[in-house]
Amino acid sequence: MSHRDHGADGWESADFPITCESCFGDNPYMRMTRADYDKECKICSRPFTAFRWRPGRNARFKKTEICQTCSKLKNVCQVCLLDLGFGLPVQVRDSALNINSHYSVPMSHVNREYFADEHDPKTRAGLDYESSFGKMQPNDTILKLQRRTPSYEKNRPKICSFYTIGQCKRGAECSFRHEMPETGELSHQNIRDRYYSVNDPVAMKLLRKAGEMGTLEPPEDESIKTLYVGGLNSRIFEQDIHDHFYAYGEMESIRVMAEDGKYDQSGSNQQQQGSIAHTGLISQQQNQHSQMQQYYMQPPPPNEYSHYPSMDTQRMGAAFSTQESDGSSTSENNRAYSSYSYPMPPHQPYPTPPPYIDIYIYI
């Protein structure tokens, strides 16, 4: 039987999956299994390397659903098929950024496989136009709807089917959720519909939410020229604010109002410094508090000779008996060597560390 070249057949091999932070989970000690050409991509129907892991202690096992070529074409996660940069469905992202990618990937079986084979080398080199989704600048709609923190709720176990009919006998030991399934449009979700951005119920809900959001309109009174910007920290300076709003017109003045950075004198030093750092007035790097660190702890100076008899190079090797005029034997010579003691050098005192100084920064 001749050897089969999987690369020539278009089969995909990878070392690590392309997933979002939510699908990876919050477990830093994660064990992942890899299976070469184990599953078929649900978009292009080509075999690819599948990965399987458990994102958390109380989470279900997750696995890759599509190949990396299809993932790079849309810049989506291989598991949940959400955008890697914004955490939104493909339909929401394309509608907000005015991207017409509905017909960019064919839907028929033969055309999908041919399209994937043609774009596979381009996506690996990063030359395809679809692979530049992550470089696009978000607009106001994206900034309002994007997911800023990872959501681990979708990693929960699936609903127990026996519990829904009242026949689950495991109780608290059941590895599935004891909840009733949701009804409505969100219960009908399809991987291909989400990838092709067609009839995605989650995307429809987010688009309706974006339409209901109010827009920031200028006031009718043109004498009002003051704009309040909140939620800033100490890392943003006046020049940064000026550079950001300069594209919208000239500014008369910028006034930064910082809160009083003096903390309460009660409590320990760590709590007092934490009260300042949590307000965002100063950065954590400027508020570091070292706990009794010994500086300039140098090792003792080296010695010119060995401290232990076993380190003597003259005694290495076998000892041979010699005939001497005084009639001494080998055992006597060995006893003479063993009776010799190597003096240990005196202990060198460590240099005195500098005095510890507490530095507090007030704003």
Curated annotation (Swiss-Prot):
<feature type="domain" description="RRM">
    <location>
        <begin position="225"/>
        <end position="310"/>
    </location>
</feature>
<dbReference type="InterPro" id="IPR000504">
    <property type="entry name" value="RRM_dom"/>
</dbReference>
<feature type="zinc finger region" description="C3H1-type">
    <location>
        <begin position="154"/>
        <end position="181"/>
    </location>
</feature>
<dbReference type="InterPro" id="IPR035979">
    <property type="entry name" value="RBD_domain_sf"/>
</dbReference>
<feature type="compositionally biased region" description="Low complexity">
    <location>
        <begin position="283"/>
        <end position="297"/>
    </location>
</feature>
<feature type="compositionally biased region" description="Polar residues">
    <location>
        <begin position="320"/>
        <end position="336"/>
    </location>
</feature>
<keyword id="KW-0863">Zinc-finger</keyword>
<keyword id="KW-0238">DNA-binding</keyword>
<dbReference type="GO" id="GO:0000976">
    <property type="term" value="F:transcription cis-regulatory region binding"/>
</dbReference>
<protein>
    <recommendedName>
        <fullName>Zinc finger CCCH domain-containing protein 53</fullName>
    </recommendedName>
</protein>
<dbReference type="InterPro" id="IPR036855">
    <property type="entry name" value="Znf_CCCH_sf"/>
</dbReference>
<feature type="region of interest" description="Disordered">
    <location>
        <begin position="281"/>
        <end position="348"/>
    </location>
</feature>
<keyword id="KW-0694">RNA-binding</keyword>
<dbReference type="GO" id="GO:0003723">
    <property type="term" value="F:RNA binding"/>
</dbReference>
<dbReference type="InterPro" id="IPR012677">
    <property type="entry name" value="Nucleotide-bd_a/b_plait_sf"/>
</dbReference>
<keyword id="KW-0479">Metal-binding</keyword>
<dbReference type="Pfam" id="PF21369">
    <property type="entry name" value="STL11_N"/>
</dbReference>
<dbReference type="InterPro" id="IPR000571">
    <property type="entry name" value="Znf_CCCH"/>
</dbReference>
<dbReference type="InterPro" id="IPR039171">
    <property type="entry name" value="Cwc2/Slt11"/>
</dbReference>
<keyword id="KW-0862">Zinc</keyword>
<dbReference type="Pfam" id="PF00076">
    <property type="entry name" value="RRM_1"/>
</dbReference>
<dbReference type="InterPro" id="IPR048995">
    <property type="entry name" value="STL11/RBM22-like_N"/>
</dbReference>
<dbReference type="GO" id="GO:0008270">
    <property type="term" value="F:zinc ion binding"/>
</dbReference>
